[in-house]
Amino acid sequence: TDTVSISFAPNNDIAWNNNHGETIDPAIAAALVAGFHTGVIDADAPDTTPWNYSVADADLDFLANGESITFSYTITATDSEGATDTHTLNFTIDGTNDAPTVSATAATGFTEDIDASLQQLTDNGTVSFDDIDTTDTVSISFAPNNDIAWNNNHGETIDPAIAAALVAGFHTG
């Protein structure tokens, strides 16, 4: 009975299909390649040994929907007489569309002057956004919630023209 040694090696052929000509960060490429493992290294023939591949989801978050990464390993079996055989194991990882994130600074509020006829009320803040899919473009838009309330202690409702003017006062840019 021959003892067979199993070894594997990455083929250094990692490719990112992203239509933007970008290359994979070397640290991420190293994490992707390090994800492959085999079980038994030396065994009496005939036998089988399991393999597995595992990579942290965070290492793939940059990969957008429609993009893929391909790479391969060569598995070599060497018997006790020195004869060898090889097999190439190919991997393809397909990306998904990770949702963008958005946040905004809260409005600080302001108080109308007693004589507000010439007063310009203003407030400002920032909208922060990100998308871990590195090739995605993020568009920011806003829509009013139609929840303008008038606290006047008389039960009156706000005039629709005034509500529209309040909504029109918000803009980005």
In which residue ranges do the predicted regions lie?
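Residue-level signal for well-ordered, solvent-exposed loop/turn and beta-edge residues enriched
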Residues: A83, A99-T101
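Extracellular interdomain linker/stem segments of modular secreted and single-pass surface proteins
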Residues: T92-A99, D133
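Extracellular ectodomain surface segments
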Residues: T1-L32, T101-H171
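Acidic, turn/loop-rich segments in luminal/extracellular domains of secretory-pathway
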Residues: H20-I93, I114-S117, N151-G173
